[in-house]
Amino acid sequence: MIIAEFVHTAFILSKNQKEDKRMKNINKKFAKEDIDCLRFIVGKKLSSIKHDEFFWGNFSTSKVSFYVDSQIFQLRLKEESLDFLWGEEDVSVFSFQKCEEKDTNTIYIDEKAPKPLITKIDEIVKNIIIIEDTIKAFNQEGQFGQFTYVFGIIIKTENKEYCFWKENYFEDDIYIAKGQNPKENMPDIDSLWNDWAPGCYSENSRNYIEISKIVE
C-alpha cells in the first residue's frame, strides 16, 4: 500500500539522517478567506449545486459549485506539493472561495467523461459543519509528525444535510452524500490511516466544528 511504502521510507531516513530531528507539523485547515465565504452563505438561499454527474461513483472531480443569492462559491480540492510526513508528496487540500460561472465547468474534456449536473435545492442554509482530521504519526523513537486537514464539510438546510469529503490524502475526488444523516456514508478515520509499516502507527481524531463557533 502507498502509505506503508512511504512511511517505511520515512522511518529508515529518520534513522540514517540523525541530524534532522524536526517533528513535522502540517496544518491544512481552512484559511480565513475560506471561513469568511462559508460564514457568508449561512442564512442565505442555496439555489443549486453543480457537480459532475455520478458516472463512476458518487463523487465530483476537484470541484463542487454552490449558487447562493446570485453568487457562486466553490469547494475545490487541489494538489499541493508538501514536505509531508514521509517526504516530498502531492497532497490534496480543500478551499472554499467565490468563483465565476466559467470556473464551474468540469475539468474533463473527453466527450465520454462525466458531464456537469445541476441539482436544484432552493433551501435556506441553516448551518455549516467543518470536518477536521488530525493524524499524529509515531515510530519507535516517538512522534515524528502531525497532519491536520479539512476532511470535508456538511451543509445543513431546512430539510436535508449535504456532505462533501475526500477519502485519501492524495486524491482529488470530492464525495457527495445527502439526506438526514449523510455522514454515516463517510469512512471512519482509522480505516484511512491503518496501513503503517512495522514500528510505525498513528493516533487519529476527527472533529466536527460548527462555523458559528469558530472564533477569529
Predicted segments, located by residue:
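Accessible peptide chain termini
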Residues: M1-I2, M23
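Short hydrophobic transmembrane-like helices used for membrane targeting/insertion
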Residues: I2-I3, V7, I12
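Short, Lys/Arg-enriched N-terminal segments with co-localized hydrophobic residues
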Residues: A10-R22
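Surface-exposed, interaction-prone regions used to assemble/regulate multi-protein complexes
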Residues: M23-E216
